[in-house]
A protein has these predicted regions:
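PAPS-dependent sulfotransferases, especially Golgi type II membrane carbohydrate sulfotransferases
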Residues: 125-168, 332, 336-469
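Conserved phosphate-donor/acceptor-positioning beta-strand/loop module used by diverse small-molecule
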Residues: 297-299, 308-333
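A conserved segment at the C-terminal end of the G1
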Residues: 185-198
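Membrane-interface amphipathic/juxtamembrane segments adjacent to transmembrane helices
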Residues: 21-50
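Transmembrane alpha-helical segments and their cytosolic interface motifs
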Residues: 58-86, 98-103
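PAPS-dependent sulfation machinery
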Residues: 203-294, 356-357, 361-366
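Hydrophobic anchor at the beta1->P-loop junction of P-loop NTPases
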Residues: 176
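Long, highly hydrophobic alpha-helical transmembrane signal-anchor segments
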Residues: 1-18, 85-103
């Protein structure tokens, strides 16, 4: 009886220490530094002289991070040692008991049970946009998405097992991108609903970078599940088979330091190796879905749309264009909606690279950090102008980038038919597109609104022209 009491106490105290100490954070830091060092070492654009200067610094950071991780792990396991000191037969007998399969099983069961109880309150809905994940799901998400090392390992295993049998990359893919709330989700869903494209879906979570392996291990993809309105409160219902903006997980794992900073997200020019890794992920998704073309919606792709359009000339990049005042008002509404998200939701949004609004908001840094207060409409109007000014230049330089006027797409079937033809599909009636009635905008700077309206009119005309309308 004493043995099991000590086992229980050790499991609970060690689990609590593990939850409180930044153990996984140190793993992530070491992994990120190792990835940077590897890219520097492989880069042909960095001279040997600079490699010799920077690599020792990376080695020092990896060494210190590994040592810190080891110390934290030892601290977390101290309760197990203390329990051994309290065990009357002695520490050696205690270590022998810990090797017994039954004791190991009980230790694991108690630890997982305690973690579930400890985090159970976190599963209660927050006022805005909380998730309904169980404690076990949350732990799995933290492991798979919170640690770059785990993500990189998962993708390496996936590529080793499945890449050779994946279809060749035709390049005829479709990438939907733009500021959040522009209509990117609904456009991507209409394209996916044609049945001609493969995409990442909620069933691929949390091992987004290993879709084939996760499909074999998980039952999530075997059934559609219950449809429910997503956290945005915009009437769009999702289930496990719904396509979603998940491939930003790859960019964050492979090249986060190149564009994600404390102040915001900077324009991103991934090198050939990083783009090649992304194309490998596309092939793996196509293998899992049995398709030959890929569709994705990723709002962060506006940061890298020019380099991607150059790297994938056969692909089409569709940029929904929404009337700026209505668009800014929608962004402000979502910012307020997600401002009080619970800690897990904030982590979840960060793991997926979603910093568009809410508690995890980090602006796009096209013209520096946007001026003003995110609680005002003018801030989001300024954000709109900066983003679409950058997209204006990218679209003008690339024939495979096209603006899609959102209001026209929603209200005129001819626009959807033109979009379908542009991406090589036989036009068919849209299933979810519908006219959206925007509310009257709040107080705003009239000059700023006029500047945005002029830019919108110019881009709308160019978009319709490229669609042949």
């Amino acid at each position: 009886m004493l043995l099991w009491g000590l086992v229980t106490l050790a499991a609970i105290l060690a689990s609590e220490a593990f939850l409180r100490l930044p153990v996984l954070g140190r793993i992530a830091e070491v992994s990120a530094t190792a990835q940077k060092a590897g890219r520097v070492l492989r880069s042909s654009r960095i001279s040997d002289h600079w490699k010799e200067r920077i690599l020792p610094a990376y080695a020092l950071r990896i060494g210190l991070g590994s040592a810190t991780f080891f110390v934290l792990l030892c601290i977390a396991l101290l309760p197990v040692l203390i329990a051994g000191l309290l065990y009357p037969p002695g520490l050696l007998a205690w270590s022998e008991e810990l090797m017994r399969p039954l004791v190991i099983l009980v230790l694991c069961a108690i630890s997982l049970g305690y973690i579930w109880l400890r985090t159970r309150d976190a599963t209660r809905p927050a006022r805005s946009g909380a998730s309904d994940y169980s404690a076990l799901d949350r732990t799995l998400h933290r492991l798979a998405l919170g640690s770059p090392m785990v993500g990189e390992m998962a993708m390496d295993i996936e590529k080793g097992l499945f890449l050779k049998s994946a279809p060749e990359d035709s390049g005829r893919h479709v990438f939907v991108t733009g500021l959040a709330r522009a209509g990117t989700t609904i456009l991507m869903r209409e394209i996916h609903a044609t049945g001609q494209f493969g995409s990442l879906t909620y069933a691929d979570m949390p091992f987004v970078l290993a879709p084939n392996l996760w499909a074999k291990l998980s039952s999530k993809g075997a059934k559609v599940g219950t449809r429910a309105e997503r956290a945005h409160g915009d009437g769009i219902e999702v289930d496990t088979q719904s396509p979603e903006a998940l491939d930003e997980v790859y960019w964050r794992m492979a090249d986060s330091s190149a564009y994600i900073g404390e102040e915001g997200l900077s324009p991103h020019a991934p090198d050939e190796e990083v783009v090649a890794g992304y194309r490998d992920l596309i092939r793996l998704v196509l293998r899992k879905t049995g398709k030959t073309r890929y569709v994705s919606k990723n709002n962060n792709n506006i940061l890298r749309i020019g380099p991607l359009a150059d790297a994938m000339p056969e692909a089409q990049f569709l940029v929904p264009l929404r009337e700026p005042l209505a668009h800014a008002a929608s962004l402000l509404n979502q910012h307020e909606r997600f401002a009080d998200s619970d800690p897990f939701v904030r982590d979840y949004m960060t793991w997926l690279g979603h910093h568009e609004f809410g508690a995890t908001h980090r602006p796009f840094l096209f013209d520096g950090r946007p001026e003003g207060d995110p609680a005002t409409l003018d801030y989001w109007l300024g954000t709109w102008i900066a983003a679409y000014r950058a997209l204006d230049a990218a679209e003008a330089a690339h024939g495979n980038i096209c603006f899609i006027p959102y209001e026209a797409l929603s209200g005129d079937p001819a626009v959807w038919a033109a979009v379908a033809r542009r991406i090589g599909l036989e036009p068919r009636p849209a299933g979810e597109l519908k006219v959206v009635c925007d509310k009257a905008p709040g107080a705003h700077d009239a000059a700023l609104a006029a500047e945005a309206a002029a830019l919108h009119a110019r881009l709308k005309a160019r978009g319709l022209a490229k669609l042949g309308l």
